[in-house]
Structure formats: C-alpha cells, structure tokens
Design a protein with these regions (language model features):
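ATP-binding glycine-rich loop module of kinase domains
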Residues: 17-42, 91, 95
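Short, solvent-exposed loop/turn segments at secondary-structure junctions
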Residues: 27-28, 33-35, 64-65, 126, ...
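Short acidic, glycine/Ser/Thr-rich loop/turn "cap" segments at secondary-structure junctions
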Residues: 84-97, 108-109, 120-124, 139-147
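A conserved mid-domain beta-alpha-beta active-site/ligand-binding segment of alpha/beta enzyme cores
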Residues: 174-177
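Catalytic activation segment of kinase domains across protein kinase-like and atypical kinase folds
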Residues: 118-172
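Conserved kinase catalytic-core helix
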Residues: 42-55, 94-120, 164
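ATP-binding glycine-rich phosphate-binding loop
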Residues: 1-24, 63
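Conserved structural core of kinase catalytic domains
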Residues: 56-104
C-alpha cells in the first residue's frame, strides 16, 4: 500500500492518546498505548456503537491493522471517522448553533453518566455540525467514570458554552464578534 498519502494532522498534538492521520482521503485516528485501555473500555462497553446509533458521536469504526500500510503497525489501534463535509469552528457559529452544541454536549454527558462513563474535557471544538445537527467528534475524550469523581470538564464547559451563551442572551454580547 502507498504510504506517500499519509499526513499527520499537526493540530492533534495535544491528545496524549493518539493523533489524527489523513490517509487516502480518509480520516483516521491512531491510538497509542496510553489510549488503548480507554478505547478498550469504550468499545467493550458498547459505548462506541451505541453513541453512534444514538447520533451523539460521529460515525466511527475500528479498523484491522492488517489492512493498513506498515506505518500504522506502531500503533495499538486505528479508528476511521466519517468525513465531515464542512469543518466549522465555535467562533464562526451563530448563537443558536452554540446553544445546540451545548445542549448536545450535555445530553451526551448525561447519557455517558448513565453508562458509567464521563467526558474528560468539554471543548467546543469537539463538536462539529453535519447540516444543522451537532455531533461529538472526539471519541477518546470519553473515559470510565470513577465513583465520586467531579466532572473534570465542568470548568471548560462553562468557558466554552455557558458563559458565552449567558452573555449573549442576557447582555447581547455575541461570542463571535
């Protein structure tokens, strides 16, 4: 297989569990040893398939490493995600889109709590729209919930969603001005 078509996404450097890789017009996420345990939990618990079926998570599937070029053999797992037709950013969204994204994020978080899981962060950049529908795109942000654990993404949710929505609705200050 041709490895000339492999490009690592520079902006995915912050994720200590894996990286985004473009290969033959496909979007792949390579998962390292740090992310393997987490991905095993997500997959074995049914969260991967069920989160996709419930339209919380963008369509994502595990790939067989044997079907990929040797470049990928150094990783523990490789995931493929549905390609998003148009990438948008929170600072480009309307007030209503930010509100939809926030509600989607909270609905997904509540679903995950019910399944014994939690989101480790609450970045608005983990949401993308396909048409008017928001989808969560960062599978490895899901982790097993530890009893008594505080929602570690709460502060980031307030910064990325709640505060801009409050300022917009109460004071007319738009988050994207």
């Amino acid at each position: 297989m041709d490895t000339d078509n492999i490009q690592i996404e520079d902006s995915s450097f912050r994720d200590n569990q894996g990286r985004i890789v473009y290969f033959n017009n496909r979007i792949l996420r390579v998962v390292n040893k740090i992310g393997k345990k987490n991905l095993d939990f997500i997959n074995e618990s049914g969260l991967l398939d069920n989160s996709v079926k419930k339209n919380f998570l963008i369509k994502t599937k595990l790939l067989n490493l044997k079907d990929l070029p040797n470049f990928f053999s150094k990783y523990d797992n490789v995931l493929e995600s549905e390609k998003i037709p148009f990438i948008s950013y929170p600072y480009e969204w309307t007030f209503d889109q930010l509100k939809k994204a926030a509600i989607h994020h909270l609905d997904f978080q509540i679903y995950l709590f019910d399944q014994g899981a939690v989101l480790r962060d609450s970045s608005a950049y983990n949401i993308q729209f396909i048409g008017a529908k928001p989808y969560f795109i960062d599978l490895l942000s899901i982790k097993k919930y530890e009893e008594g654990e505080y929602w570690i993404g709460y502060k980031q949710f307030c910064e990325n969603f709640l505060n801009p929505l409050l300022l917009g609705s109460l004071k007319g200050i738009q988050h994207n001005d």
